[in-house]
């Protein structure tokens, strides 16, 4: 009996455990509301919260019309393009919503600590969809035509057919080691002041800058082998493969406080604390603003929505660019940006150029469409602003040297496009564009892997980590890694020279263009346009050395004390930003990465001295960190002894080498892949060089054979006539391509069969099959046709700004402005022309005529009225005479002499009086 009672009690408890949560789950979990309605309301509230924070940020930026602070300039340079911004915003909505859900769930006693244990799968999918993240987490739909093997997609998607998101824009950076977040999921290293690492707190990043990293501008050592162009190329290529967007909001999501006004860690605010004394950088403030990088959708705390809130799904950061070496610096990484950059009116597949300015007949980059924070020439008229430049990467205006390289490639694309069109007149504008883009991408790969990376790694490390190309490997993930982007490839910051040198035709200091301090060229495109153009700057990059990375001279004070300084409104410290970014991303410590690269761990001061032979620097690092495991990977790798004939130590050589091999071997469109170019084309591509690019796109007539090798002019320079160049005859098509009305087709082969892939000219859409294949019975489908698109009806993505009127024309559209406005640089936005409207001149003329007419009419009326009054008075006098003469005769006769006498006297008086009156009138 007792056994039966015990069994019954057990069954009752089991049933209650199973059924009661099921019964109450819909009500009690959220205080009487249904699960779905309450959770959805939380998501909507979170969406409003994030939107409000972003709105406050935008409103603050719009009000800011004077000189921008360094923090605002950094935010501008980190501003993602619209697609990346949408992904970031969706992730932030999810991040904020899950925090709210956690609070509700965790406050309930005896509830599971994971929302996934109490939220249904359908509801989780609904939440993900409402936040906006779900579409960006699904695999992209890859095109199924043979063109998919001919040209890479602008987004980088579908490069790997089995893993279409590998290397694509707006996907998470790769993790080669698990992150080291303080909570295991999302919280940065150093977030909690009480959190200890091996018994010690992490040192403040600003203190590391001041004691270990910074050197005065006058104390830098110059590199005796490599030119300043080596440094610039590294920065340029970094911007081709990696861009981590900051939070879209500059205000805390909870409470909405401005991140520039708080020194507390409130997501997305992660401020850099100032030193307690003697810190010139932060005089008058307690901290420097810093914003966390956006999380990739579905990672970190957002993982709760996808059933994976755990340390196995930590917060990941997003790469807004394609990972591939594909010249996205020239063409962008999204269809929207690519559309802005192209010249759609040209039949030669050109890129847009600046419409207002030229450099001795050569093109400049176009300006951005709206007012930008770039500096203006002192004393310049506000009506003649020089905005930031528009390029494939938004950081093109950060520094003049970087702008110069962007400009060279704009010119090179257009040069190639014109030549290719001349060789193949039957090619459509899009075919010319794609072929020129393909060549430019290949040249980026060649210059980087053949000329740049071996100098950085040294020949031995290059052979060990990169080696010879053996063909495309579909099992290799080319995605840029977090440690490469956030730490290793930032070694180049230690090679930035504090001076910008501009040279004359003889490669001497220019008499009219003195050297500039680094902080004088930040966000200053006006200097390129107003001060001599591209050539003096390029001469300086070729003939002047880079800064040498020395252990006790790691970074010049132009970067640590005056980063992005355009006014007296503060500054930033690049070294501190790098260290804080590594902690934000949860990068494991220095020793973890040494172990990853099969290098020995450093456990003692003596061990550290072997990796860093400058004992003073090694001791400072140990005194600050207290333990080698605590050392931030960026600083540890930066301070290591160089490998032989290299510009990095063993750790960074390993990380950079592994990444470059992955970018090469995991890229289906790598230039050496025999399916991408013909053998003849590959031979021609190998001849080209950065020196040749400079010869073809500047006024320079002599250059070094190797543009990265510093030399003396003229003995180390070669005539451009002797610099090898591409013979584009290898791209001539020998067969005729028939014309297609308002479109074109491209020949290609698929499974050994001839195929035609059709495309329409810009402004037309395809109706029918995009690809037709030649079979035994003829073409498998009839050819498609191209129909005009009415772009003006596109309400989701209107072609013209709201300030302009859209007019559809055949194959295109026109944006029309009302006088006195005119089309801006983007040809879509109306801007003030600075003059009176034409209608104003007509109005003034008509007004003058009208006023003159009214004055004349008034004068005429007055004169006519005066004349009429005079004539009336004369008529009255005559009438009086007549009346007098016609008075009754009887009366006159009765009066006779007496009346006659009186009458005669009176008449004399009246005439006298009348004459006097007429005279007065």
Spans of features found by a protein language model:
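Terminal regions of secretory-pathway proteins
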Residues: 2-400, 418, 423-743, 853-858, ...
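Alpha-helical transmembrane segments in eukaryotic/viral proteins
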Residues: 12, 17, 837-848
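N-terminal entry motif of extracellular EGF-like repeats
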Residues: 737-742, 766, 772-798, 819-837
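Repeat-scaffold signature, strongest for collagen triple-helical Gly-X-Y repeats
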Residues: 797-800, 809-810
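Single-pass type I membrane-protein transmembrane alpha-helix
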Residues: 841-867
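Interhelical loop segments of eukaryotic multi-pass membrane proteins
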Residues: 867-875
